[in-house]
Amino acid sequence: MANLAVKVADLEAACDWYASAGATVTEPVAWENGRRADVMLGALQITLFTKAIYEDATTLPDEGFLHPALFVDDLDAELARHEKVLWGPRVVSGSFGTRRIAFVDAPGGMRLEFMEQIEDPN
């Protein structure tokens, strides 16, 4: 697993809260259609988003758990196992390098993000 994604209404307040809990928190940055920051809390990485990249494809609450992000070796093979892809695949780049990503709906009213690493970070 790469990280857990959480949507927050107030990114700065969420970053401050995690920092006061002892986490290492990156500075918020612009990301796709919103902003994001990464939180390292022990072995757990949480990515805080103000807007999910797939928000136009599904109904989401203003705040809450979005999805776990999972690495796969072959995104196309993974997606072939699912009846419907909610969003993607699409190539994204950032401090994490370059990845192909896609999202599927999963039982329990949640989504899964599958990520294939194309280029490692510089």
Over which residues does each language-model region extend?
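Short, charged/polar, Gly/Pro-enriched secondary-structure boundary elements
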Residues: 43-47, 109-112
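Mid-chain, well-packed structural core segment of small domains
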Residues: 61-87
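Residue-level marker for the onset of beta-strands and adjacent loop->beta junctions
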Residues: 2, 33-35, 66, 100
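Vicinal oxygen chelate
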Residues: 28, 38, 83-122
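N-terminal beta-strand motif that seeds the catalytic metal site of vicinal oxygen chelate
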Residues: 1-13, 65-68, 118-122
